[in-house]
């Protein structure tokens, strides 16, 4: 697997434009946590004893596991992320940034699929490589990126009972079903209980998407360019683009069953918990 990884460019797009709208005030956390959540992009919240941003941990993890050409998508008016990495000057990787602006006539960006489209169009030299897409506000178990590099097109499907996250949060995660050939059958967003029951795997697990996947450059670019806006939210959504592409390429997206816990920043309490877990050594992948 490692030889395969090092033989390719292995580009990575990290979605880091989230503002952390659910980082509301809470009496259960110290004041410094609330200040951190209110003053920084969610991916740049500092955790652990070394006070290193979560996004920096993610970039370092990706580099260690063979992804050396990294593009970070940041929000308009983000004055923290790029200056941090410019000062850091991480070696051994090609690090670039794309800004997702708010189009005229809108109050928010045009969606996650549009963010990926911007990153792809800014890197035409990636054509011919498979592109990994990552979520900037959580940290996967170590080994996940390397496991993904063995497949030109894959979607990790994590056992939801071993994510290390609160059950009420996990309950809302998109569930993944795969066919007998190991390809993606469907992704069900915000599943109800009946949908969850229908998605139980033969081994008794329910497996969910953590918003990481890998698809060849040309296929991914076509998928995000052609996905329609959601009729209500008026956004071009990445899960829809991925599902649409998969429907047109039967067995094209390999579902990779994995297990392991994530560090996730959704609520202020997560900042303290993630830091404590990181100081203890983080999490390992189980395949």
Region roles according to the model:
Residues 2-14, 22-28, 32-35, 48-130:
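Conserved N-terminal catalytic core of the sugar/cofactor nucleotidyltransferase
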Residues 139-223:
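Conserved core of the sugar-phosphate nucleotidyltransferase
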Residues 128-139:
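Short beta-strand-to-loop acidic/aromatic patch adjacent to the donor-nucleotide binding site
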Residues 4-12, 187-287:
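Conserved alpha/beta core of the MobA/IspD/sugar-nucleotide pyrophosphorylase nucleotidyltransferase superfamily
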Residues 80-83, 143, 241, 273:
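Phosphate- and divalent-cation-binding pockets in alpha/beta enzyme and binding domains
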Residues 101-108, 162-164, 194-195, 261-264:
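A short acidic, often aromatic-flanked loop/helix-cap motif at beta-alpha or helix-coil junctions
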Residues 44, 175-178, 255:
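A structural signal for short hydrophobic beta-strand segments in well-ordered beta-sheet cores
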